[in-house]
């Protein structure tokens, strides 16, 4: 259980760092928002696994300590999600904010805009047309990146669910084997096999995280 708790603490710290980056630059790229969303899902899944293990420990001082940790982590995850939603909502309004701030310089801005329009028109491409094309390109790139991040998130959720299923199956098998009188040596061999499956799971998860990181680095 301590290993899961330590892992959740690390995930929480990384998530806070990403949220701080988002807060420093409200108009953050969609790649950063996708990274935060994935980190939130990972933290919530880890908390669920930790909570499931705590529920199996019964009662006592040790169980109470871990239950308190689960509550603290759950509150942190909920607070992080609320903060992320607030920052994401704020990032949708940077253009309106900038327009209001630039109001006192309206005359100068109009003259500059007229000059830019004249220059672009002379080249055969009005300013608004160039902006529209640029926005379309950005929209297509963002949609592609969102699709990649969505696939990564779904893969992460599937892998976490498979890991939970393996844990439940292993626990049931051990209980059944002890009931049938199977020797501890045999149960240990089964346990080693389960550990190999866990190693495969975590290796796959690591590769997925690395892949998402490079996608964000390239497109973010």
UniProtKB/Swiss-Prot annotation:
GO MF terms here are:
SNAP receptor activity; SNARE binding
InterPro entries on file: GOSR2/Membrin/Bos1
Q: Where exactly are the transmembrane stretches of this chain?
A: 199-219
Q: Which GO terms describe its biological process?
A: endoplasmic reticulum to Golgi vesicle-mediated transport; intracellular protein transport; vesicle fusion; vesicle fusion with Golgi apparatus
Which ranges does the record list as Vesicular topological domains? 220
Keywords, ordered alphabetically: Endoplasmic reticulum, ER-Golgi transport, Golgi apparatus, Membrane, Protein transport, Transmembrane, Transmembrane helix, Transport
Q: Could you tell me which residue ranges are on the Cytoplasmic side of the membrane? A: 1-198
What is the annotated localization of this protein? Golgi apparatus membrane; Endoplasmic reticulum membrane
Bilayer topology: Single-pass type IV membrane protein
Annotated Gene Ontology cellular components are: endoplasmic reticulum membrane; ER to Golgi transport vesicle membrane; Golgi apparatus; Golgi membrane; late endosome membrane; SNARE complex
Reply yes or no: does the keyword rRNA-binding apply. no
Q: Can the keyword Membrane be found in this entry's annotation?
A: yes
Gene3D superfamilies named among the record's database cross-references: 1.20.5.110
Signal peptide region: none
- One Pfam family matching this protein: V-SNARE_C
Question: Its biological function?
Answer: SNARE required for protein transport between the ER and the Golgi complex.
* Sequence similarity: Belongs to the BOS1 family.
Query: What is the protein named?
Result: Protein transport protein BOS1
Recorded source organism is: Eremothecium gossypii (strain ATCC 10895 / CBS 109.51 / FGSC 9923 / NRRL Y-1056) (Yeast)
């Amino acid at each position: 259980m301590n290993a899961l708790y330590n892992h959740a603490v690390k995930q929480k710290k990384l998530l806070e760092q990403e949220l701080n980056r988002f807060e420093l630059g409200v108009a953050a790229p969609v790649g950063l928002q996708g990274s935060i969303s994935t980190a939130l899902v990972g933290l919530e899944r880890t908390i669920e696994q930790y909570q499931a293990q705590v529920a199996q420990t019964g009662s006592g001082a040790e169980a109470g300590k871990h239950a308190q940790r689960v509550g603290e982590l759950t509150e942190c995850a909920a607070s992080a999600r609320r903060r992320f939603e607030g920052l994401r909502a704020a990032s949708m309004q940077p253009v309106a904010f900038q327009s209001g701030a630039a109001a006192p310089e309206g005359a100068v801005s109009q003259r500059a805009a007229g000059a830019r329009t004249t220059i672009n028109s002379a080249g055969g491409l009005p300013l608004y047309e160039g902006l529209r094309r640029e926005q379309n390109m950005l929209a297509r790139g963002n949609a592609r990146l969102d699709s990649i991040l969505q696939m990564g998130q779904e893969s992460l959720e599937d892998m976490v669910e498979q890991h939970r299923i393996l844990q439940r199956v292993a626990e049931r098998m051990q209980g059944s084997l002890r009931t049938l009188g199977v020797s501890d040596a045999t149960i240990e061999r089964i346990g080693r096999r389960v550990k190999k499956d866990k190693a495969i799971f975590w290796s796959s998860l690591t590769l997925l995280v690395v892949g998402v990181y490079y996608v964000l680095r390239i497109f973010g």
